[in-house]
């Protein structure tokens, strides 16, 4: 790119600023300050000349200056837990300063302090009342929050905090503490708990952790060091010196404020350099003495500590800082082997952030994968590369909603690391540098993951060009989109991509001042903002936006067909659901859908053999119904859910084909035998009497009620069965097992599984009834008819009854609806509930109404679009009922279609009204505001709405164009081929 001197100067200046307060003993750190740690340091006392005094009064003064009018401490609060911990620790400091008169302290108005404490207590109560444990992401909060409440209650009996989340909080706390042993902290191996010793006051002997100090600090935590200094039996001058250095040289710069961690030498050095290098800055751009010093620090620590380092010298090693350092040194051409990283952090399915970690981190694994890909001999680490690639794809595929990580609250942070490392991975694959590392299926999954991780930020950009009005989040978004420009999947989206980058840069340029760049989105005990790191992301985004495109990647995974893509986009843009959307959004959803198609095609014969049917052209569009509906409202249901539903939709098309082209022919003259086959396959036992979450088997763990429908593994009296029977039974058994024994179904409640099994049975039986009802019409299919002559069904039921029962069941919507319900109930129900997707009677009734109106509507739309096809194939259509023949008059088929369209619109209005009432009932039952139950209920409703829109879209598109595969007309030829199968 053309040399941009101002940006280069800024980047070099940033590197120089990192060492502005560097100390050879303590290192450096620029993390923002936190009231939580400041409060703990303010509690340290020391006896001087026989009199106890507050050692750091400036810290307490800072707390007084920053208390809000509402009573809490709000600076830097980006999550509810921030306010709770900042306020709780500061309240403890206030109480101790008010009630400990014998300690020498600056003169304060005790009445003022008491008033401040009252306001702080009120604020804390309000914040605790709103706490939702299930959405709290900060590591260790379940230990630290109770540890803060205990001393407050001991300090003042009136400070007893009772709040809705206390019970679930204590349940998590007790479970974790039941595994804790003080001896763990007394050994030679450092543990992460050393960073939070204030949570173990009264539980450990502080004298026995003295050997874990690093230059006086307890794993770089001011609050943990303060707790140690307060509770060790002997005064520790090194720890006092450390705290004094932090107060003077950390981000507080002598104001009395301290951060949650100091120093962070390795963390900030490696993150800043890798961020700048990734964007395209070179070592020559950044050349200065400070760059040499940073590299010297990283290289020296990496060598001294044996190839695995922590966020500062001497601290517990973690894979993040180790991997980032390896990547930094590799870019600079330095030797940095990942062997020790692999030895220390590799687990069975992923890489741990640190030894003993329980919940794996996506970003840590992205960093580890990046370090391996930076090796000149990356293929040597093929097994580790494959392992991490599978893990990061699985992590993405299983994540519901926006991706989360435990080190940063912004979903774009894990996304940018994921996108960068997958682009590098695909690039090496296409250069032939990783032969045989990834199988074809994993490559398909990589392609989908990469595209979604790039597309969703493009969809989520705010109108003013930002992401969440955050300067750092906006930098992440820009970096993701600049990577997307290299991915060939986005070649047809270059215009919106470039415009989004331009608007993002314009927003970033409009922000100025230090405070505008302090985004408290990083996670420590409380959220923090690393100012220099934020600046590095902003500079990287600006540089990358101006850089020429790198080599294109992705062509080996998928090449978009230009003609077919545009044709489908134009078709679907006519649908009512999409008319208001920009065409590029539909094109993006179509590309995403096309990336699912190879995966579906790879498994298209897993269940049905697909004999004697036309080309399965529906595979080219089936995924689009799911991707488009998912993207339309930014629902972002998990990718695994999308794939499962695409596969179910494919099976539904195949089931229709199989029942018409195979089972319907083999059993044409004895349909009752086919009915009996289905009854044999899905035998009824008992009726559903009770709800309850299942544990694996077929019984409700609470009530003992058995399943009302059980599956048979083989046909009964097999010696008396014909080969035709066995063929059909085998295919339908494989189909029903795939659905009813799907992993997400196995963990659903008994009630939801019963309903699914019943609807599955009704679905299969409806195909038989449909075939019988169609028989008289199929005999007329080859008789020439004028277009204005209507075939009339001889069915004895009314159109109203037929379209709501047999007809609605036949299109698969009801059983698919209950498949979704099983998934939602299993995945998105509060722990301890019965696990039903719709727990209350009102929700169950209204959900059933939504389902039936949806199915009826879709069948009507289907019949509008497939009238000609049904006539050709002899299938019963809504328009064949006498009600429409009587209303045709002189207008013929068009009058009939208009009448059916009006009825379909009535059903659509009815489904929308039923869904609105279901949402109202759900809010009434589960609460309209915060809390785990209400949050999960809203999420279930969002995904149900997404499902309903997908069904609605099917109906709308059927009206525009019939997408089912045609069944061959020559039934004699079909029968001959089927007979050949048994010979």
Swiss-Prot record:
Any single biological process term in GO: diterpenoid biosynthetic process
InterPro entries, per database record: Ent-kaurene_synthase_fun, Terpene_synthase-like, Terpenoid_cyclase/PrenylTrfase
Domain of life: Eukaryota
The protein's required cofactors: Mg(2+)
EC number: 5.5.1.12
Binding site for Mg(2+) 2: 656, 660
Binding residues annotated for Mg(2+) 3, in chain numbering: 862-863, 866, 870
Region of interest (Disordered), residue spans: 685-721
Keywords assigned: Isomerase, Lyase, Magnesium, Metal-binding
Motif DEXXE motif per UniProt: ranges: 656-660
Reactions catalysed: (2E,6E,10E)-geranylgeranyl diphosphate = (+)-copalyl diphosphate
SUPFAM superfamilies the UniProt entry points to: Terpenoid cyclases/Protein prenyltransferases (SSF48239)
One function term, GO molecular function aspect: terpene synthase activity
Chain ranges for the short sequence motif DXDD motif as given in the UniProt record: 318-321
Leader peptide range in chain numbering: none
Biased composition (Polar residues): 688-698
Binding site for Mg(2+) 1: 656, 660
Gene3D superfamilies the UniProt entry points to: 1.50.10.160, 1.50.10.20
Record-stated family: Belongs to the terpene synthase family.
Role summary: Involved in the synthesis of labdane-related hydrocarbons by catalyzing the conversion of geranylgeranyl diphosphate (GGDP) to (+)-copalyl diphosphate ((+)-CDP).
Protein name in UniProt: Copalyl diphosphate synthase
Organism (species): Phomopsis amygdali
Gene name of this polypeptide: PaDC2
């Amino acid at each position: 790119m053309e040399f941009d001197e101002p940006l280069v100067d800024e980047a070099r200046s940033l590197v120089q600023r990192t060492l502005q307060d560097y100390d050879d003993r303590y290192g450096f750190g620029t993390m923002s300050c936190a009231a939580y740690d400041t409060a703990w340091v303010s509690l340290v006392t020391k006896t001087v000349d026989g009199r106890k005094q507050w050692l750091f009064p400036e810290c307490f003064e800072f707390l007084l200056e920053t208390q809000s009018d509402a009573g809490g401490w709000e600076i830097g609060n980006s999550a509810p837990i921030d306010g709770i911990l900042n306020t709780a620790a500061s309240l403890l400091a206030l109480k101790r300063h008010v009630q400990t008169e014998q300690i020498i302290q600056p003169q304060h108005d005790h009445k003022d302090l008491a008033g401040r404490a009252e306001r702080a207590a009120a604020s804390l109560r309000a914040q605790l009342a709103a706490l939702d444990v299930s959405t709290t992401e900060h590591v260790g909060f379940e230990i630290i929050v109770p540890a803060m409440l205990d001393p407050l209650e001991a300090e003042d009996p009136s400070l007893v905090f009772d709040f809705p989340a206390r019970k679930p909080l204590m349940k998590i706390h007790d479970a974790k503490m039941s595994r804790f042993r003080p001896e763990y902290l007394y050994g030679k191996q450092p543990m992460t708990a050393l960073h939070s010793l204030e949570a173990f006051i009264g539980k450990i002997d502080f004298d026995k952790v003295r050997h874990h100090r690093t230059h006086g600090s307890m794993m770089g935590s001011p609050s943990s060091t303060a707790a140690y200094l307060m509770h060790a039996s002997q005064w520790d001058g090194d720890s006092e010196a450390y705290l004094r250095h932090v107060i003077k040289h950390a981000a507080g710069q002598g104001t009395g404020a301290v951060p949650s961690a100091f120093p962070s030498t390795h963390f900030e050095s490696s993150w800043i350099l890798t961020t700048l290098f990734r964007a395209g800055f070179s070592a020559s751009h950044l050349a200065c003495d400070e760059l040499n010093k940073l590299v010297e620090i990283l290289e020296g620590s990496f060598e001294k500590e044996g190839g695995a380092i922590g966020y500062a010298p001497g601290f517990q090693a973690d894979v993040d800082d180790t991997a980032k350092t390896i990547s930094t040194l590799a870019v600079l051409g330095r030797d940095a082997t990942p062997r020790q990283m692999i030895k220390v952090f590799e687990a069975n399915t992923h890489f741990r952030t640190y030894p003993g970690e329980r919940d794996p981190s996506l970003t840590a694994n992205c960093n580890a994968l990046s370090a391996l890909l930076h090796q000149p001999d990356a293929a040597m680490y093929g097994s580790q590369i494959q392992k991490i690639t599978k893990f990061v794809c699985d992590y993405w595929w299983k994540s519901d909603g926006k991706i989360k990580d435990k080190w940063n609250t912004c979903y774009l942070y894990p996304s940018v690391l994921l996108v960068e490392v997958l682009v590098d991975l695909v690039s090496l694959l296409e250069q032939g540098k990783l032969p045989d590392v990834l199988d074809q299926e994993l490559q398909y999954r990589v392609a989908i993951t990469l595209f979604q991780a790039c597309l969703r930020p493009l969809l989520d950009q705010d109108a003013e060009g930002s992401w969440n009005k955050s300067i750092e989040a906006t930098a992440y978004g820009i970096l993701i989109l600049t990577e997307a420009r290299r991915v060939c999947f986005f070649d047809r989206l270059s215009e919106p991509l470039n415009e989004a980058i331009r608007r993002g840069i314009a927003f970033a340029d409009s922000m100025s001042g230090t405070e505008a760049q302090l985004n408290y989105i990083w996670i420590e005990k409380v959220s923090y903002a690393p100012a220099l790191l934020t600046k590095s992301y902003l500079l990287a985004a600006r540089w990358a936006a101006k850089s020429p495109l790198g080599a294109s990647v992705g062509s080996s995974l998928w090449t978009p067909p230009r003609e077919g893509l545009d044709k489908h986009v134009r078709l679907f843009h006519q649908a009512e659901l999409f008319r208001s959307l920009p065409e590029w959004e539909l094109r993006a959803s179509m590309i995403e859908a096309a990336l699912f198609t190879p995966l579906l095609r790879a498994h298209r014969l897993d269940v049905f053999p697909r004999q004697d049917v036309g080309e399965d052209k529906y595979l080219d569009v089936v995924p689009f119904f799911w991707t488009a509906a998912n993207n339309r409202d930014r629902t972002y249901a998990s990718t695994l859910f999308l794939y499962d539903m695409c596969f179910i939709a494919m099976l539904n098309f195949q089931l229709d084909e199989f029942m018409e082209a195979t089972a319907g022919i083999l059993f044409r003259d004895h349909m009752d035998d086919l009915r009996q086959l289905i009854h044999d396959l899905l035998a009824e036992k008992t009726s559903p009497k009770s709800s309850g979450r299942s544990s694996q088997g077929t019984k409700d763990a609470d009530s003992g009620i058995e399943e009302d429908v059980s599956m048979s593994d083989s046909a009964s009296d097999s010696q008396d069965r014909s080969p035709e029977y066995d063929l059909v039974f085998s295919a339908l058994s494989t189909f029903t097992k795939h659905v009813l024994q799907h992993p997400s179904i196995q963990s659903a409640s008994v009630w939801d599984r019963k309903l699914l099994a019943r609807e599955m049975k009704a679905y299969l039986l409806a195909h038989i009834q449909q075939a019988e009802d169609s028989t008289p019409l199929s005999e007329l299919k080859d008789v020439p008819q004028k277009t204005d002559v209507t075939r009339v069904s001889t069915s004895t039921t009314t159109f109203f009854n037929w379209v709501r029962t047999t007809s609605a069941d036949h299109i698969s919507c009801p059983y698919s609806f209950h498949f979704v319900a099983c998934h939602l109930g299993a995945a998105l129900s509060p722990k301890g509930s019965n696990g039903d997707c719709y727990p209350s009677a009102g929700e169950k009734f209204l959900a059933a109404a939504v389902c039936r109106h949806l199915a009826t509507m879709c069948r009507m739309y289907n019949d509008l679009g497939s009238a000609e096809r049904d006539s050709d194939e002899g299938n019963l259509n809504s328009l064949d009922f006498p009600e429409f023949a009587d209303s045709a008059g002189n207008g013929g088929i068009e009058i009939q279609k208009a009448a059916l369209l009006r009825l379909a619109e009535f059903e659509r209005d009815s489904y929308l009204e039923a869904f609105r009432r279901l949402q109202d009932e759900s809010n009434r039952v589960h609460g309209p505001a915060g809390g785990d139950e209400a949050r999960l209920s809203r999420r279930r409703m969002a995904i149900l709405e997404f499902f309903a829109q997908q069904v609605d879209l099917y109906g709308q598109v059927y009206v525009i164009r019939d997408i089912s595969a045609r069944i061959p007309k020559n039934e004699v030829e079909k029968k001959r081929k089927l007979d050949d199968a048994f010979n």
